[in-house]
Regions:
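Structural signature for solvent-exposed beta-strand/loop edge elements and short helix-capping sites
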Residues: 1-177
Length: 177
């Protein structure tokens, strides 16, 4: 992808493959025509461009210790995803997280304008911090331009109970539906 970076730390070992690294210092690394900012680092080598850190979008964040970047997409075998409402800002200036999940395989396409996140573990869940619920589902699809998220559970085929939503509020005593 196209990358713009200022005030960065460079590390280059010309006789070693995969040893050209750019690490952000005070400003995020701007990527994908300004649609995302990486707080972290990138490395360029024979295998292409890789990176680590948190990619910020207008309404989402994807964090990983290892991204694989390509011209119109990026992937990660293990990532975290957080969906925020563009206009929902807390008193401290940070965005309110509506949906978040960890330990997912990420596949985000700027060409198709969507991201797909699949759970790496059968006991993973999706968290709704504002509503104080968690849901046992293993797939989430993010539509970038619509600010929408679809969730699915392929566990339904095995588990006849289906998707479960569980309250995390102490006064609701783990109410489930």
């Amino acid at each position: 992808p196209d990358v713009e970076a200022a005030d960065v730390k460079l590390h280059w070992e010309p006789y070693q493959p995969n040893k050209f690294e750019v690490a952000q210092t005070s400003q995020a690394i701007v990527m994908y025509s300004g649609e995302s900012k990486l707080n972290g680092k990138i490395a360029i080598g024979e295998a292409g461009m890789t990176g680590a850190g948190t990619l910020e979008f207008a309404s989402a964040e994807v964090a990983s210790k290892k991204f694989r970047f390509r011209k119109e997409d990026f992937k990660s075998d293990t990532a975290s995803f957080a969906f925020t409402a563009r206009d929902e800002v807390k008193n401290d200036g940070t965005k309110e997280v509506a949906i978040k999940t960890d330990n997912v395989k990420a596949d985000v396409s700027f060409k198709n304008r969507q991201g797909q996140f699949k759970s790496n573990s059968a006991d993973s869940y999706i968290e709704f911090p504002v509503n104080k619920y968690i849901a046992y589902m293993d797939e989430l699809r993010w539509y970038m331009d619509k600010d929408e998220v679809d969730m699915n559970s392929s566990m339904n085929e095995i588990d006849l109970i289906g998707s479960r939503f569980v309250s995390t509020r102490p006064d609701q005593d783990s109410i489930t539906f």
